[in-house]
Amino acid sequence: MKKIKIGLMGSAGRMGQEIAGVIEANPRCELVYAPLRGEKWDSKKAQAVDVWIDFTSPEALKDILKKASETKTPVVCGTTGFSKKEKELLKTYSKKIPVLWSSNMSLGVAVLNEALKAFSAISHFDFQIEEIHHNRKKDRPSGTAITLQENLEKAVDKKLPEALAIRGGGVFGVHKIFAMSDEEVLTFEHTALNRTVFAKGSVQAAEWLVKQKPGLYQIRDVLFGKSKK
C-alpha cells in the first residue's frame, strides 16, 4: 500500500508535535517534510509532498498557499485568527488546489455544527454560546465559537449575543450551546480532552483531501460530503 506523504508546517509548535506523532502512528501516512521557520526551502522535498497540514500563523498563510499551488499540492489548514482578507486568500487559492480550512479539526465539533441545524425548529428560544480555553489562548472568542455562532445564527435566522469567552488553566477546549425558553433549557456541549483529537482530525482530513478536486472544504465535508450551496 502506497503511503500518503505529508508535509507539516508548524511542526515545532504544540499542535505540530502532536500531529507528527499521529502521522507516525498511522500506517497509511508518513511525514516526509517538516520545514522550520527561517529554514531554507527545500524544493525537492516539497515536490514529494502529497498534502500539506498547516498549523502556523495567519501571517504565514499567503506564502504557504503560494508554495503549495506551485506544486499543485492540497492544503489542510487548522490555523485560526484569520482576517477577512486572509479568508479571501483561502477562497482564491482553492480555485487552483484543494484547500480544507476549519477553525476546529475535531470530528465531534463537526457533528455539533451539523446538529445546530435542528435548532431552526425552536428559533423562538433564547440562545447563548459559551467557550472555555487555556490561559495562553490569544483569540477570544475562539475560532470554533465564532463558527458555531455563525451556523447557529443561520439556523435560527436571527442575530444572537456574542459568545462568552473564558480563559483559565490548561483547558483544551469546552464549547456549550444553550437554548432557553420559559419552560426548559437545552444544552449541547463538546469537551476536548487533549490535543490528539485535533491532530487525528487533521490527519484524517489530509487523507480525504488528497482525493478531492480543487475547492474550499471544511472538516464537516470529510464526514458528510461537500455541502451544496
Curated annotation (Swiss-Prot):
Entry-linked PANTHER family: 4-HYDROXY-TETRAHYDRODIPICOLINATE REDUCTASE, DIHYDRODIPICOLINATE REDUCTASE
Reactions catalysed according to its record: (S)-2,3,4,5-tetrahydrodipicolinate + NAD(+) + H2O = (2S,4S)-4-hydroxy-2,3,4,5-tetrahydrodipicolinate + NADH + H(+); (S)-2,3,4,5-tetrahydrodipicolinate + NADP(+) + H2O = (2S,4S)-4-hydroxy-2,3,4,5-tetrahydrodipicolinate + NADPH + H(+)
GO biological process: diaminopimelate biosynthetic process; lysine biosynthetic process via diaminopimelate
Positions that bind (S)-2,3,4,5-tetrahydrodipicolinate: 134, 143-144
One Pfam short name: DapB_C
Function: Catalyzes the conversion of 4-hydroxy-tetrahydrodipicolinate (HTPA) to tetrahydrodipicolinate.
Highest taxon of source: Bacteria
UniProt GO cellular component terms: cytosol
Enzyme class: oxidoreductase
Enzyme Commission (EC) number: 1.17.1.8
Residue sites binding NAD(+) per the record: 10-15, 78-80, 102-105
Principal location listed in the UniProt entry: cytoplasm
CDD domains, A to Z: DHDPR_N
Cell location: Cytoplasm
Name of the protein described by the UniProt record: 4-hydroxy-tetrahydrodipicolinate reductase
InterPro entries reported for this sequence: DapB_C, DapB_N, DHDPR_bac, NAD(P)-bd_dom_sf
Sorted UniProt keywords: Amino-acid biosynthesis, Cytoplasm, Diaminopimelate biosynthesis, Lysine biosynthesis, NAD, NADP, Oxidoreductase
Family: Belongs to the DapB family.
Active site residues of this protein: 133, 137
SS bonds (residue pairs): none
Gene: dapB
Gene3D superfamilies recorded: Dihydrodipicolinate Reductase, domain 2 (3.30.360.10), NAD(P)-binding Rossmann-like Domain (3.40.50.720)
GO molecular function: 4-hydroxy-tetrahydrodipicolinate reductase; NAD binding; NADP binding; oxidoreductase activity, acting on CH or CH2 groups, NAD or NADP as acceptor
Pathway: Amino-acid biosynthesis; L-lysine biosynthesis via DAP pathway; (S)-tetrahydrodipicolinate from L-aspartate: step 4/4
